[in-house]
Each structure stands twice: as C-alpha cells, then as structure tokens.
C-alpha cells in the first residue's frame, strides 16, 4: 500500500528503500536496549506510512507543524506553522559533504518556501567544548543557526551509549566521543548532555 502511494506520487524506488531502511536501525536499537529485536518507536513509523518523512541522501526530511515559536534570521515561525524538520539517522558518517548534498536534495524535494529546522542533540552548543573544531559533528553544527537549546532532553546519552543510565560511572569509554562526553558530564553540564 505505501509503496503504491510512493509510485502514485512519482517518488522513486530508491527514496522508498532508503526511507524504510530506517526500520533496520530501530530494530537494532531495540536489541541493544532490551536484548531482543523489535520496534518500540511505533509513532515514529506512522510518518513513513503517511508519506510525511523521506530519507534524501544522508538525512531525513519531514513535513510537520512546528512545535515551537522561534525566529530564524528575519523569519518568524509560530507554533503550528508548517516546517521541514531535518532528522539525522544513525549508521553513517555525518560528513560536511553528505550534509550539504542532503540539504540540496531536501530542498529540491520539499521546496524552499517553508523553513527548515533541526531539533537534535548534535546541535547542543556544549559539544564545542569537548570535540575538535574539525569534527564532523561540529562542522554539522556550523551549518545551522542555533535558535534555542532544549534542556529537558537526554537523547545524547541514548545516542552515544545506546541507553540512558542513572549512574554516570556505568557508561563505557570505548570511543573518543564517549570519553569526552562522560568527562564533560562529570565536570559540569548538570550531569547530562542534551
């Protein structure tokens, strides 16, 4: 059914495949967190079925109503205004070239009339304190104007370690990002990275 809807709208088989490959990541995440394969992000996949989110290159682009009031440049966006939300799926390096190519593809697909917004832990300003200036994450951040920081989220911990823990000491230190994030959380940042 969903594939038929893609065909009716003239959306390529490649975009369908890339968009639905997302299921693989969420199944893997479920295994990491619970020890069995499955999907516990049901509401996320309605977006795929309703054809509101598409993977175009490295990133996903979703048409949605803004959940926030914000000003970007000279443009005011009110809660409920249509926007294109940019999501960063796991699984591949986030190179500057892949980000730029993906944004070009997103704008070719959705147009340039609506504002584009990214609500991600990768944009947390404190990452500039722990990562090298030339890291892919910092180069990604530099593509955006940071409008606001969401202090209530703990997605970074989940993304960096696969699970949010109450005790900071149980977090592994297998990668440079894990080591830097754990040290940062221990020193400051209210014990978390957004």
Locations of regions flagged by a protein language model:
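Non-catalytic substrate-recognition and accessory regions of acyl/acetyltransferase enzymes
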Residues: 1-94, 111-115, 126-194
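An acidic- and aromatic-residue-enriched active-site/binding cleft used to recognize and process polar
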Residues: 121-124
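Well-ordered, non-membrane alpha-helical segments in soluble/globular domains
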Residues: 95-110
């Amino acid at each position: 059914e969903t594939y038929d809807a893609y065909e009716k709208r003239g959306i390529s088989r490649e975009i369908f495949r890339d968009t639905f490959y997302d299921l693989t990541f969420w199944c893997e995440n479920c295994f990491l967190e619970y020890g069995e394969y499955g999907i516990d992000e049901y509401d996320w996949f309605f977006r795929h079925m309703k054809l509101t989110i598409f993977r175009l290159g490295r990133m996903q682009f979703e048409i949605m109503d803004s959940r926030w009031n914000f000003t970007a440049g000279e443009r005011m966006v009110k809660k409920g205004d249509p926007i294109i939300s940019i999501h960063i799926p796991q699984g591949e390096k986030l190179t500057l070239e892949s980000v730029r190519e993906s944004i070009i593809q997103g704008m070719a697909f959705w147009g340039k009339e609506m504002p584009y917004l990214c609500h991600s832990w990768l944009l947390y300003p404190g990452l500039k304190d722990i990562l090298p200036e030339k890291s892919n994450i910092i180069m990604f951040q530099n593509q955006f104007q940071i409008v606001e920081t969401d202090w209530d989220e703990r997605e970074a911990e989940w993304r960096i370690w696969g699970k949010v823990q109450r005790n900071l000491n149980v977090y592994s230190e297998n990668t440079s990002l894990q080591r830097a994030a754990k040290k940062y959380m221990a020193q400051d940042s209210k014990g978390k990275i957004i």
